[in-house]
Curated annotation (Swiss-Prot):
Identification of the protein by name: Ribonuclease T
Organism: Azotobacter vinelandii
Superkingdom of origin organism: Bacteria
GO cellular component, one term: cytosol
Family (UniProt): Belongs to the RNase T family.
Keyword terms of this UniProt record: Exonuclease, Hydrolase, Nuclease, tRNA processing
Quaternary organization: Homodimer.
Ranges where the Exonuclease domain occurs: 18-99
This enzyme's EC code(s): 3.1.13.-
Amino acid sequence: LQEIFRGVRKAVKSHGCKRAILVGHNSSFDLAFLNAAVARCDIKRNPFHPFSSFDTATLAGLAYGQTVLAKACQSAGIEFDGREAHSARYDTEKTAELFCGIVNRWKEMGGWVDFA
């Protein structure tokens, strides 16, 4: 974790931020595991916010009416191979694609209101 966190802290600093926000599909589950590992390893400098995260299950439910990763990806026009599903790397890559797709199209889908 220390090695991974070094890279995350470097990216956070280079963007002028104070903390990273975890992105995950059912992210509260992942964040709980991350926080437990941090405590177990007695890591003092966790770059991730301790209780905030972006949950693609919730965001996809709002954006596409789908909370299952495979169905949300299909609704977003992202290829999803069911044979690859549930491998940590594949699901992580698809979650990242889904998150970026939702964020990049959120305004055109009516997710932001310009009050200016």
